[in-house]
Amino acid sequence: MTNLRKSHPLMKIVNHTFIDLPTPSSISAWWNFGSLLGICLLLQILTGLFLAMHYSSDTSTAFSSVAHICRDVNYGWLIRYLHANGASMFFICLFLHIGRGTYYGSYTLSETWNIGILLVFSTMATAFLGYVLPWGQMSFWGATVITNLLSAIPYIGTTLVEWIWGGFSVDKATLSRFFAFHFIMPFIITALVMVHLLFLHETGSNNPTGLNSNADKIPFHPYYTIKDILGFVLLCFILLSLTLFTPDLLGDPDNYTPANPLNTPPHIKPEWYFLFAYAILRSIPNKLGGVIALILSILILIILPLLHTSPLRSLTFRPFSQCLFWILVADLITLTWIGGQPVEHPFIIIGQAASILYFSIFLILMPLAGILENKIMKM
């Protein structure tokens, strides 16, 4: 009798994905973030489901329903803060996953990479919708400012914004639809994750050398299932430390004030994981130009395969490109810091310089470094 996991139609899919999957023997801990993202997604769906049972998507009761969850529901405070800080962990893993893909040239697997970028946009949209739901000051004004950006679209902009709002301002209709979309989006993300994995398993994983590893592969289980447990334990430790000791560390104090359309907070800003894109948006004085730059800050990842000028896939053996990569990381940290600062001197000029450097590294410096390294290798 054949093994059930190799003969049963459903078990076969699981077997080919998590058990007998041929995996390069040289992949490092940087390849752990895919499975960690899966765990984060599962955690967000479960905690979100329990929060949705007690949440009210009406403007008059939304804020008090979140307070009710934290005060009266059994372990409601834990579920709420696991969900909020789980989103932060999700984005930390996401940024590290993209960083690893950029460093090791995983963007050459174009279908997997493009679905991944679609996943980034979906995750960012979901996080934005979720940030509006507690209906605090920053929720309301964040929703107003970010949705208002669509009015920069020529001709249809204003109509589009009013259509999204369901009226002439962010109100009850907006909150109801944002809650509905926030609920459905994680399931769309889960479907996209399956497509992402499907394309990945068509080509096989990349590895730190960037070379073909068909001659040296090992089964995923038990080697990488055991290895992934370490990442899982670290993720749980960081998430629980955040949730139990400093649950509001990454949040905004303004969100503990109920939404008030008549009182604008002194500094409107999104969650920390959007600050780099927000800084790029603010660094351009023109509204439409800022919106285009905001979208391009993520969309630029799509053209990375076209900007790849080196015969080597990974940056492991490319010192100039490595320097540029770490300058890019420092630049992103600078942009994140600038996004959280008020719009005044010297933050404006620092943000503009960091934004120019961000696009220059991708579009000009990285391709030039690849060409230079080619010439040095041929000498």
Curated annotation (Swiss-Prot):
Protein name: Cytochrome b
Disulphide-bridged cysteine pairs: none
Intracellular or extracellular location(s): Mitochondrion inner membrane
Cofactor note: Binds 2 heme b groups non-covalently.
Residues involved in heme b b566 binding: 97, 196
Role noted for this protein: Component of the ubiquinol-cytochrome c reductase complex (complex III or cytochrome b-c1 complex) that is part of the mitochondrial respiratory chain. The b-c1 complex mediates electron transfer from ubiquinol to cytochrome c. Contributes to the generation of a proton gradient across the mitochondrial membrane that is then used for ATP synthesis.
Transmembrane regions: 33-53, 77-98, 113-133, 178-198, 226-246, 288-308, 320-340, 347-367
Binding locations of heme b b562: 83, 182
Cofactors (names): heme b
Record's signal peptide: none
Record bears the keyword Mitochondrion: yes
Keyword Disulfide bond in annotation: no
GO biological process, one term: mitochondrial electron transport, ubiquinol to cytochrome c
Family: Belongs to the cytochrome b family.
Residues at which a ubiquinone binds: 201
GO CC terms of this entry: mitochondrial inner membrane; respiratory chain complex III
One function term, GO molecular function aspect: metal ion binding
Keywords: Electron transport, Heme, Iron, Membrane, Metal-binding, Mitochondrion, Mitochondrion inner membrane, Respiratory chain, Transmembrane, Transmembrane helix, Transport, Ubiquinone
Note: Heme 1 (or BL or b562) is low-potential and absorbs at about 562 nm, and heme 2 (or BH or b566) is high-potential and absorbs at about 566 nm.
